UniProtKB/Swiss-Prot annotation:
Organism: Escherichia coli O157:H7
Family: Belongs to the UPF0509 family.
InterPro entries referenced in this protein's UniProt entry, alphabetically: UPF0509
Ranges that cross the membrane: none
Lineage, top ranks: Bacteria, Pseudomonadati, Pseudomonadota, Gammaproteobacteria, Enterobacterales
Gene: yciZ
The protein's name in its UniProt record: UPF0509 protein YciZ
Length: 57
């Protein structure tokens, strides 16, 4: 995802819910992990470099 789009995130969450209804927990978890990584990467790209606390290294 190139920019945060609440509608797109909602659609992807809906897909994960459909996968859960189908009892495919492994795929649902995998899809959530991918979505989380994409969102975290996007936030990291859009925020200035802030020094990390020692426990975040």
């Amino acid at each position: 995802m190139s920019e945060f789009d609440a509608q797109r995130v909602a659609e992807r969450i809906d897909i994960v819910l459909d996968i859960l209804v189908a009892d495919d927990y492994h795929s649902a978890i995998h899809n959530l992990e991918i979505l989380k990584a994409e969102l975290l990467r996007q936030v990291a790209e859009s925020t200035p470099d802030i020094p990390k606390a020692p426990w975040e290294i």
